[in-house]
Curated annotation (Swiss-Prot):
This is Dual O-methyltransferase/FAD-dependent monooxygenase CTB3. In the C-terminal section; belongs to the paxM FAD-dependent monooxygenase family. In the N-terminal section; belongs to the class I-like SAM-binding methyltransferase superfamily. Cation-independent O-methyltransferase family. COMT subfamily. It comes from the Eukaryota. Pfam families: FAD_binding_3, Methyltransf_2, NAD_binding_8. Pathway: Mycotoxin biosynthesis. Its EC number is 2.1.1.-, 1.-.-.-. Keywords: FAD, Flavoprotein, Methyltransferase, Monooxygenase, Multifunctional enzyme, NAD, Oxidoreductase, S-adenosyl-L-methionine, Transferase. It comes from Cercospora beticola (Sugarbeet leaf spot fungus). It catalyses: nor-toralactone + S-adenosyl-L-methionine = toralactone + S-adenosyl-L-homocysteine + H(+); toralactone + NADH + O2 + H(+) = 1-(3,4,5-trihydroxy-7-methoxynaphthalen-2-yl)propan-2-one + CO2 + NAD(+). GO terms for molecular function: FAD binding; monooxygenase activity; O-methyltransferase activity. Residues 430-871 are annotated as: FAD-dependent monooxygenase.
Length: 871
């Protein structure tokens, strides 16, 4: 019951979040309506990647809600809908009904039946069944028109070709699977398949295809759609392997390459490569003719492609190739025949040559999205029904390679693709290593095959500073890991701009980062200037100013590094990009003490199992709420607006020059009577110029223009309690940023114009308003666990007034990494307890420092007296 409730809640949250993201995108689009367009268009066409990701996650969550809400007694009813919908779809396609449906406007059932020469009553019943499933529309009684779905088939002949192939060949074969099993049992014979029974033929699929021109044409139309479809598309072949690393003139053999679509796509992007496309004689003849007649293929591409007649079951005749490319080849054949194909290539491999296989890699059940897994299972069953073959899990691929004297050196599963890419070499040349772009799903598959918790990755919840630092430390130590971030991408929301690191964090970064990443980090930092200037907000005069002094002394703040947050996070992702999954929010986790594993369940319905879970998922940490359920987070009573103002000539002319040397503070203290009688507390502005050296810009031209980082902090009543509360209700982040920017102007409306320039010229899209939360300095201990812990803001959030939140998180990550390096990814519980105790001591010191700063800057009361933070 609890599992059901958790799954339902997670799916509902995913629907809400992604529906809002989708609506925000649709409302912001300024598509010009094409008045000459006739067929309805899909409003989701041409959306950006972020919107498409939200759409996919919405569809996934809706699918899960449907599964959860349907009662067992209704299952057969939904199957009935499925087969009747398919029946109606076939009727509409085979009787060419869409040819007679107008591209714009409606048509009566009577007129449509007359045009198509079909019985009117049948037409109406069949159309209305299709309408129930979104195919066609009936906007008024007895008037039918295209829907956005049916319009695709009227607009794109390749989809209609796929439809004809599905209803005439795929469906009959699928329906006869049980009969084939009853007749032949377990067999790999190509003429004893469900396809043979469904089509009533005696020969294997490809033999029948060659003998049947109509079927051959239908199959070609189907394959054209496959190559153009994004989930099956050739772009993944282009980007999924490092073709650029091959030497100039390198030879690629496209084994079983058919018409050469794969080679052509790669050749267009990589002009230094040559290609040999191999296939059977009749296929090669057709391919040569088609390429010669295709004016869309440039001569420079054609000149680097040759065709060769070849049967891949025979000896490989090209022995000087650098890469042998097999796309959708092995899945057509059972293991014994696939082994022959691979062995023939293995015998021809020159030293250093590779095999690139683009084919389906089946996930373990439940480790990828429902919709993705459905498509992969469809492919698996299709191979079984047509060829007595199968799609393979990673373990199956590994075993197949081993049988042919090969081994997998790299695995890449592109997002939104039904096929992965396997890079293969002769056995003994390499081993599957940490450089692979293995997705969490494939990691789960590997782990399941070995059964060893030690082989499972460390799971890191959150790609903030603590999470990425821990990831880099684990990479440096050779410990496998995966990072899961709830945001859809790294810049999904403003998170502040400037960070200052002191000596302890600087040392931890040196411990954590590989040498090349640390060197890049140092060079990408902003110029650090030590000092402070204080201004009167009302007349714009300097009150206090000191260069160095206390800030550079032993008792003051001594910043080792001044860091642009975005540049820093980018550096922290260097070399581990393939280990980070965005748009993955943990719903809950569960531990298995007997297996020493922990499984994270995500709100999109997927899950992944690891050896250890580190909660670095911030203030709203799901890991903390489970691991330390009674942990106290308090509301400091403050709100803070973070902002960024670029140092344009106009800004430099208006803002006080001496306010742009180092740290500047402006304190807006309440008037006397308000302070005495009402208890009005101050509002404080902290700002600092962020400038980059010429050397940094020469090395990293993508660094932002010089800017001023600022934070305006004060009691939330000064910002308007209602405004602070309502910010989280904005659908659009742009709306929230704009409102925060307006609020900064309202709070400082009586300030001197020279200082107000900071807010008037700010980048309004970069402003963000947050409520300031903290934990108390004396953090109570909790029961430790051997395979789960929390660190950073997940467990000890603190006010920004101390300037040490990020410092503390970095040192936490360094300390936890040392535990995992020393004890492995199944550390004893006492080792985790010692880490957590030291973390609490470290946090206490820094929370106290933040508390002191908060009292001065906005009149915060003692943290122990603050009320609970309401999320």
């Amino acid at each position: 019951m609890m599992q059901f409730q958790r799954d339902l809640e997670a799916s509902l949250e995913a629907v809400s979040a992604n529906a809002q993201e989708l609506l925000k995108s649709l409302k912001s689009r300024k598509d010009v309506q094409d008045l000459n367009a006739s067929l309805p268009k899909d409003p989701l066409d041409n959306c950006d990647a972020q919107t498409q990701a939200a759409r996919a996650q919405l569809a996934e969550a809706a699918t899960r809600i449907l599964r959860l809400s349907i009662r067992p007694q209704e299952y057969l009813e939904h199957l009935q809908n499925g087969y009747q919908h398919l029946t109606c779809f076939r009727w509409l396609v085979e009787l060419n009904i869409l040819d007679h449906l107008p591209h714009s406007g409606t048509i009566s059932y009577t007129d449509l039946a007359r045009k198509a020469s079909v019985p009117p009553m049948q037409l109406r019943s069949i159309c209305r069944m299709a309408i129930c499933n979104g195919f066609l529309e009936e906007p008024e009684a007895n008037q039918v028109r295209h829907s956005r779905i049916s319009a695709l088939f009227a607009r794109d002949e390749s989809y209609l070709g796929w439809a004809r192939w599905m209803v005439n060949y795929s469906v009959p074969a699928a329906y006869k699977l049980s009969d084939a099993t009853r007749s032949w049992g377990e067999t790999v014979a190509k003429d004893q398949t469900a396809f043979n029974l469904g089509m009533d033929v005696k020969v294997p699929f490809f033999d029948h295809l060659r003998q049947t021109p109509a079927m051959k044409d239908a199959f070609a139309a189907y394959m054209r759609n496959v190559t153009s479809n994004a989930t099956w598309g050739l772009q993944h072949a282009v980007t999924g392997f490092d073709w650029a690393s091959l030497p100039r003139g390198a030879k690629v053999v496209d084994v079983g390459g058919s018409l050469g679509h794969g080679s052509i796509a790669i050749a267009k992007e990589h002009t230094h490569l040559t290609f040999v496309i191999q296939d059977l004689p009749e296929t090669v003849a057709g391919a040569r003719k088609e390429m010669a007649q295709n004016d869309k293929i440039e001569a420079s591409v054609k000149s680097r492609i040759t065709f060769q007649e070849h049967d891949f079951f025979g000896p490989q005749t090209v022995k000087d190739a650098d890469v042998y490319f097999l796309r959708m080849i092995c899945h057509d054949w059972p293991d014994n025949e696939a082994k022959v194909i691979l062995s023939q290539i293995r015998a021809a491999l020159k030293p250093g040559a590779q095999i690139v296989i683009m084919d389906t890699i089946l996930p373990q059940p439940g480790t990828t999205s429902v919709l993705q897994e459905q498509q992969l299972r469809i492919r698996d069953l299709t191979m079984m029904e047509v060829f007595n073959a199968k799609e393979r899990e990673l373990e199956d691929w590994s075993s197949l390679m081993q049988s042919a004297g090969l081994e997998i050196s790299r695995v890449n599963q592109p997002l939104n693709s039904v096929m992965g890419l396997l890079t293969v070499r002769s056995a003994g040349q390499t081993a599957l290593s940490g450089t692979n772009t293995l997705t969490p799903e494939l990691v789960t598959a590997v782990s399941a095959s070995t059964g060893s918790a030690d082989s499972r990755p460390v799971l890191i919840a959150g790609a903030g500073i603590a999470g990425l630092c821990l990831a880099q430390a684990l990479k440096k130590a050779g410990i496998d890991f995966r990072v899961f971030e709830r945001d859809s991408h790294i810049d999904a929301r403003p998170q502040g701009y400037r960070l200052k690191f002191e000596a302890d964090a600087a040392q931890s970064l040196k411990n954590i980062l590989p040498d090349d990443v640390y060197e890049a980090f140092e060079l990408s930092n902003a110029v650090t200037a030590v000092g402070e200037t204080d201004f009167n907000p009302f007349n714009g005069n300097i009150i206090h100013s000191r260069t160095g002094g206390g800030l550079s002394g032993k008792k003051g703040l001594y910043a080792t590094f001044t860091v642009d947050r975005k540049a820093f996070r980018t550096q922290l992702m260097t070399g581990i990009e393939d280990k980070i999954s965005f748009g993955k929010e943990i719903a809950y986790y569960k531990t298995d003490d007997s297996a020493s594993t922990v499984t994270a369940e995500f709100k999109d319905g997927t899950h992944v199992t690891g050896s250890f879970l580190a909660g670095t998922d911030g203030l709203h940490s799901v890991v903390r709420k489970t691991c330390v359920p009674d942990h106290r987070i308090v509301d400091t009573g403050a709100a803070c607006i973070y902002g960024k103002t670029v140092m344009t000539p106009e800004f430099l002319a208006r803002f006080p020059e001496k306010g742009l040397r180092f740290m500047t503070v402006v304190s807006d203290i309440a008037p006397m009577l308000q302070s005495c009688l009402i208890g009005d507390s101050p509002v404080t502005l902290l700002l600092e110029p962020i400038r980059f050296s010429e050397a940094s810009r020469a090395r990293y031209p993508e660094l932002p223009a010089d800017y001023v980082y600022w934070a305006l902090i004060g009691p939330k009543e000064r910002f308007g309690s209602q405004e602070v509360t309502s910010m989280k209700n904005f659908v659009s982040l742009d709306q929230a940023a704009e409102q925060a920017a307006k609020l900064s102007l309202a709070v400082t409306e009586e300030w001197h114009p020279s200082l107000r320039a900071l807010f008037e010229l700010q980048d309004t899209k970069q402003a963000s308003l947050i409520r300031v939360a903290s934990t108390i300095p004396d953090i109570p201990s909790w029961e430790s666990h051997s395979n789960v812990t929390v660190l950073g803001d997940s467990i000890h959030p603190m006010s920004p007034c101390g300037g040490v939140g990020a410092n503390t998180a970095i040192v936490d990550a360094d300390a936890l990494a040392k535990v995992l390096v020393e004890h492995g990814t199944k550390p004893p519980v006492n080792a985790i307890a010692e880490f957590e105790a030291a973390m609490r001591t470290r946090a206490k010191r820094n929370i106290w420092r933040s508390e002191v700063g908060s009292k001065r800057m906005f009149g915060q009361k003692n943290l122990v007296d603050c009320s609970e933070f309401v999320f």
